[in-house]
Amino acid sequence: MESLTLQPIARVDGTINLPGSKSVSNRALLLAALAHGKTVLTNLLDSDDVRHMLNALTALGVSYTLSADRTRCEIIGNGGPLHAESARELFLGNAGTAMRPLAAALCLGSNDIVLTGEPRMKERPIGHLVDALRQGGAKITYLEQENYPPLRLQGGFTGGNVDVDGSVSSQFLTALLMTAPLAPEDTVIRIKGDLVSKPYIDITLNLMKTFGVEIENQHYQQFVVKGGQSYQSPGTYLVEGDASSASYFLAAAAIRGGTVKVTGIGRNSMQGDIRFADVLEKMGATICWGDDYISCTRGELNAIDMDMNHIPDAAMTIATAALFAKGTTTLRNIYNWRVKETDRLFAMATELRKVGAEVEEGHDFIRITPPEKLKFAEIATYNDHRMAMCFSLVALSDTPVTILDPKCTAKTFPDYFEQLARISQPG
């Protein structure tokens, strides 16, 4: 297996221009494909997940052109639901941001299409979304294991009253919200259980509004969506930088700054993961906010005990930053780590112990006490981009670290290690 050994980093300093947000890129691509008119997306993320969405749109007859660096995309909207001319299978890798929204959108009208992906995708639950779509008339068949992809979709979603469980993934609600305006009837979506990752719903609502559709949000408990609507292209749309990707550089500065400035997001960003910077501030770093940047300057870091449900992806970065904080850090309400690219609670606990930390792994929390001195280890990454990026922070000590399968960062950030090297000074 390929590996990358990072030598100790004495200091980080500099500016990082963030790649486009994965969450925003894939939502914008789908809405542009469903909309009337031509949409030009700029600062689009070029990564595996986005390529899976683009390949699916091609198979569905959507025409688009990409710039040479794949960050500018001109899409000719379909002016309504997408149709596969003949029955076909779409392979979506391990891209939840493609699988969930497409599973809903392809239930409009009369399709016959199979959605499948990598082995890990077949372990990521989708039952709550399927249950909700079926309530609205969709005809969906599980082809292997009940409640998991691959799925056969045969259209039929017309709207109506739909209950959806929000306790596992906000992407199920996102998928329903984006699909419902194109259904023939009105849809009333009721949330069962606690809605996780609420800020990701705000991204969805914000983008839908950009494409001309507003819905009634009743305190995130119920959403009323008028049927028979259509999306309209906004013309040009700039994709924000990826706030989850920003977390690694901001944390690096908190640990070994200097100062690191990330551009492409700022105080008015629609991504909830910008709140990660508040957590670093609480730990003792200095944060400065601009309209188009966030900067972080080193501080003496102290442990925290916090509910991280609002920033589940960026919270992983706090787990490795905790290795550099004084005291025991507890991250709570993070059960949904278990249904991501890998079981991230298990993976994080296992790898933190390798570098010498004392770790308690609970059903929905993790507690981390750093060692006096970090140990050299080979870090398994579980084909999870965030594991690779999180554990790069171990090199900010006087101990090197080896990352196995470093190219797994291609899911969201193909040149992550080059960017980290650019702002790093060796120990």
Curated annotation (Swiss-Prot):
Active site: 313 (proton acceptor)
Quaternary structure annotation from Swiss-Prot or TrEMBL: Monomer.
Protein task: Catalyzes the transfer of the enolpyruvyl moiety of phosphoenolpyruvate (PEP) to the 5-hydroxyl of shikimate-3-phosphate (S3P) to produce enolpyruvyl shikimate-3-phosphate and inorganic phosphate.
A Pfam entry, by short name: EPSP_synthase
Pathway(s) where this gene product acts: Metabolic intermediate biosynthesis; chorismate biosynthesis; chorismate from D-erythrose 4-phosphate and phosphoenolpyruvate: step 6/7
Binding-site positions, 3-phosphoshikimate: 22-23, 27, 169-171, 197, 313, 336, 340
Gene: aroA
Single GO biological process annotation from the record: aromatic amino acid family biosynthetic process
SUPFAM superfamilies assigned to the protein according to its UniProt record, in alphabetical order: EPT/RTPC-like
Entry GO CC: cytoplasm
Principal subcellular localisation of the protein: cytoplasm
Protein name as it appears in the record: 3-phosphoshikimate 1-carboxyvinyltransferase
InterPro entries: Enolpyruvate_Tfrase_dom, Enolpyruvate_Tfrase_sf, EPSP_synthase, EPSP_synthase_CS, RNA3'P_cycl/enolpyr_Trfase_a/b
Compartment(s) where it occurs, according to its Swiss-Prot or TrEMBL record: Cytoplasm
Organism placement in taxonomy: Bacteria, Pseudomonadati, Pseudomonadota, Gammaproteobacteria, Enterobacterales
Presence of the UniProt keyword Transferase in the record: yes
S-adenosyl-L-methionine among keywords: no
